[in-house]
Amino acid sequence: MPLLVTSASGANGDGFGALLSFELDGTLRGTFIDDDRIVDPRGLAVDPRENLLFLNSGADRVLAISSQGRIVRDTGRIEGLNPGGGIFGPDGRYFVGLRSERTIGALPTSFDAALEHVLPPRVVPFPRGFAFGQDGRLFLASGIGPDGQGDNTILAFTPAASIEPSRLVADPELSPLDLAIAPNGNIVVSSERPFGAVDAVMSVREYDAMDGHLVRVFSPNGRAEFCKPRGLRFGPGGLLCCVAHNEVVGFDFESGECLGAIARLPRLNGQALVFFP
């Protein structure tokens, strides 16, 4: 099961602008798919029902890719999409972070219907990661945008009141970049505080999903560079992975121990990662 990583380019980082594939021992396989529709790739998610990889392209489109590395569906260019992260929701649709509109949209996996706003436009100053909790609530990390504007919190939206979120997390040491739900139902967030600062503190932080209190902090403890942490993903055997500037860093979620870099590549500028197929 290879590890796939989106490597940013352009304004998002001086990376390779490609979807890269690594062996589980960290060996670089190369580019998973070479297609000019993949530009400054961002969010990734696997649809287990069809075993397809969904990729958010900086070319304002979403692509569905087979395990053989072929594009099998393409939304075509959606004006102003500017997608960020992507996940599958409880209803089976593909949810996309909309950076310019500061909200979240959803698409059917068949791409046969228009993008639908799930939350109102500009619901946060700048959306970072988001995920659905085990109780159906939608958690959205609100962070700092490229222009330096924004806030640092996590909001919770209930299905019945998506317009009136609750401010779940108020942590002065948090500046979120991505968000995922842990096997125990808690929220884990990658953080760079202050965002963009040369002396920023990098961490992965776990919060209680019910009251938002800080449970624990994962840190590299000298076993990894861990600069510019971005996308989070849980892998096999309780492995928590976080992609960063030059590496993918692994943590044992149960113990909290940093396992070091499980893959390294100078200028990786990783944005998101998945294990696929």
Regions found by a protein language model. Name each.
Residues 8-10, 57-58, 99-100, 143-145, ...:
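Short loop/turn segments immediately following the C-termini of beta-strands
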Residues 14-16, 35-49, 78-94, 100, ...:
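Beta-rich, blade/repeat-based domains predominating
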Residues 1-30:
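An edge-strand/N-cap motif at the start of beta-rich repeat modules
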Residues 27-35, 70-77, 113-121, 163-170, ...:
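A short beta-strand motif characteristic of beta-propeller blades
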Residues 23-27, 65-70, 108-113, 157-162, ...:
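Short loop/turn segments that connect beta-strands within beta-propeller blades
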Residues 16-20, 61-64, 102-106, 152-156, ...:
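A short loop-to-beta-strand structural motif that recurs across blades of beta-propeller domains
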Residues 245-277:
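Blade-level signature of beta-propeller repeat domains, shared across WD40, Kelch, NHL, RCC1
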Residues 4-7, 54-55, 95-97, 139-141, ...:
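Residue position within the beta-strands of beta-propeller blades
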